[in-house]
């Protein structure tokens, strides 16, 4: 059975999608942007470090709201609009959110643009906490 999940406290979706879908213990988490969960119309944070922190904090909110956490993430996909410029700085922030030696598999993709002019977006594949 497939479940369509919304997480309280996470940024509201700005298009027709769920925060995540669940199937047989797997969680497919929609890409999060650096939007303010309290005010999705607020300006985005300045710089890749602040935007990466906001994205990962938003992902933590989504995961907590659907019964998981960052330590249950098995795969991440990162989208960067300025790959060469922002890759190293994004990695420093990204790595700080995971326990040493427990980094999920990951793909990082350079893209020509993201909604609202964001610099970064990240989606995840995770397991539910009870698995």
Predicted regions and their residues:
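N-terminal presequence-like segments and the immediate start of the first folded domain
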Residues: 1-57, 61-74, 80-131
């Amino acid at each position: 059975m497939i479940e369509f999940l919304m997480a309280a406290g996470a940024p509201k979706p700005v298009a027709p999608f769920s925060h995540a879908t669940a199937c047989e213990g797997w969680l497919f988490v929609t890409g999060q942007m650096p939007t303010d969960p309290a005010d999705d119309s607020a300006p985005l944070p300045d710089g890749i470090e602040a935007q990466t922190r906001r994205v990962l904090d938003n992902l933590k909110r989504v995961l907590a709201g659907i019964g998981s956490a960052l330590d249950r993430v098995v795969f991440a996909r990162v989208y960067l609009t300025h790959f060469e410029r922002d890759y190293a700085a994004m990695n420093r922030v990204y790595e700080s959110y995971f326990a040493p030696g427990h980094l999920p598999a990951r793909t990082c993709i350079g893209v020509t643009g993201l909604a609202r002019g964001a610099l970064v977006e990240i989606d995840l594949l995770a397991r539910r906490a009870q698995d």
